[in-house]
Amino acid sequence: MARTRPPNPPAPSITATHVESSNIQQTRRGIPITGTLRLRGEATATEESPAERRHIRWAEDVVDNEGQGKKSSKVCCIYHKPREVGESSSESDSSDSDSSESNSDSEIDSGEARMTNSRSPRRHLHNHDHGGSEHSGHGRKRPKTKPKVNAYERVPKYNEKREGTGEGP
């Protein structure tokens, strides 16, 4: 059974007429509209060129969190402020630590040891002996692990149970 839909009625429109002798406008329905709206740009207190006013000015607390010279107000990467070599982080200052040295295994994941500006891997330092091999792998290959998917890339799982809901074919 086919249904036909009546055409959509036209949207109501208003026509404004400007009368030069007064500041009153009238609509098609005869309702007077009074008033004038004047829009002005923001007045600047300092003497700046027009090109300087159009540029984005970042606050001092905004960081370049990707190392590419681009500042952003949204954080898309975890930023770790660079520290001096001997300086410790607040996480490793706990009293239950076995070692008093600052470069422990817990600091490896700080982001500093992962990549340099040239995007090449950097050797990481930690406090255990490798027997002089310096991460050579001792001749064995590690099984390749699947990379972790972050929350933005993960596809949500939906219930495919539709029989009891009345939906579906």
From Swiss-Prot:
Its annotated compartments are: Nucleus
Q: Where is the composition biased (Acidic residues)?
A: 93-110
**Would the keyword Cytoplasm turn up in this protein's UniProt record?**
no
Bias kind Basic residues: ranges: 138-147
Q: Where is the composition biased (Basic and acidic residues)?
A: 50-60, 128-137, 154-169
- In terms of one coarse class, where is the protein primarily found? nucleus
Give residue spans, biased composition: Polar residues: 14-28
Residues covered by region (Disordered)? 1-169
Family membership, please give it: Belongs to the YPI1 family.
What name does this protein carry?
Type 1 phosphatases regulator YPI1
Database matches in PANTHER family:
E3 UBIQUITIN-PROTEIN LIGASE PPP1R11, E3 UBIQUITIN-PROTEIN LIGASE PPP1R11-RELATED
Q: Per the record, GO CC terms? A: nucleus
